[in-house]
């Protein structure tokens, strides 16, 4: 079945000379037709070091694509329902190292970045992340960057934002996703989203990627397919079945769902889901919803 994943941190792992769980072999075995690769630099390092890290990850991304027939990168073009290869897309997770320097944003777009979040969990010069109280939100510079994103058909990712920033993005941004999260209805964690936020994303024709991180799924270090299934069930019950998908966060999480240790395990998850949900729900969830969302906004350009 066509599978798509809206978030992984494999590039950081490769940049740190570690071997990623998301790689050519596991993508192939998992039937992954579409994989988003996030550019991320640890926020503790200096702005200069973060900029250098992002450059390094971009270079590594293009090297990987060049070296493998199985990875395709064609920014701003239509993505086919074909998982005999993987369409690799690029996003930026946290943009404190760019601030509102639009030359740098343009440069990133020219290198294939099509989606970006303003901040990680912290508060930076653009927005306030999920660790921050709601008296903080988007800054003037953050609003300017959203405007640039709208003008350049860049998707605004609200994963990691606090609620205040989220609602401001909903108001200002054209195309909004939460690339890797779970639901607060099932676990009240600052990285998860409320039913009200889900409804706003449905309204906006956005997208929600569900992570495999047990800490966000049930608050422990252990989760099973059934815990993941409960997230899906809840989202379907509040009318979000057409906008949900996978946002694994592989290579960015310290534990994962039992039986789902890397992309090669997707067929097992799919079989489990097919035994419990309608086929069209499963097809949407594991890939088609994200592919369609991505094509909708690419065509809009
Ligand atoms: Zn993240």
Predicted regions and their residues:
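A metal-dependent hydrolase metal-coordination microenvironment
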Residues: 26-103, 130-136, 140-143, 147, ...
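Active-site beta-loop-alpha junctions enriched in small/polar residues
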Residues: 7-11, 40-42, 91-95, 121-123, ...
């Amino acid at each position: 079945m066509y599978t798509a994943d809206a978030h992984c941190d494999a590039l950081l792992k490769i940049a740190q000379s570690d071997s990623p769980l998301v790689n050519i072999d596991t993508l192939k075995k998992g039937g992954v037709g579409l994989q988003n690769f996030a550019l991320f630099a640890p926020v503790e390092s200096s702005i200069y070091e973060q900029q250098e890290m992002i450059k390094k990850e971009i270079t590594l991304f293009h090297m990987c694509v060049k070296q493998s027939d199985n990875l395709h990168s064609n920014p701003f073009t239509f993505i086919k329902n074909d998982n005999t290869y993987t369409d690799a897309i690029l996003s930026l997770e946290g943009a404190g190292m760019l601030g509102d320097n639009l030359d740098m944003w343009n440069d990133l777009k020219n290198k294939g970045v099509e989606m970006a979040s303003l901040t990680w969990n912290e508060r930076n010069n653009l927005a306030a992340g999920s660790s921050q109280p709601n008296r903080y939100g988007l800054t003037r510079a953050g609003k300017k960057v959203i405007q640039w994103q709208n003008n350049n058909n860049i998707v605004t990712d609200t994963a990691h934002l606090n609620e205040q920033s989220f609602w401001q993005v909903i108001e200002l941004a054209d195309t909004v996703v939460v690339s890797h999260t779970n639901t607060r209805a099932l676990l009240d964690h600052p990285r998860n989203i409320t039913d009200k936020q889900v409804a706003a994303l449905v309204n906006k024709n956005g997208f929600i990627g569900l992570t495999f991180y047990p800490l966000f799924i049930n608050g422990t270090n252990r989760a099973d397919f059934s815990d993941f299934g409960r997230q899906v069930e809840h989202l379907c019950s509040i009318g979000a079945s057409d906008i949900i998908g996978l946002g694994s966060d592989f290579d960015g999480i310290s534990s994962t769902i039992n039986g789902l240790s890397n992309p090669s395990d997707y067929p097992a998850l799919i079989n489990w889901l097919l035994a419990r949900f309608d086929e069209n729900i499963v097809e949407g969830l594991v890939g088609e919803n994200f592919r369609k969302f991505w094509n909708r906004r690419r065509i809009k350009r």
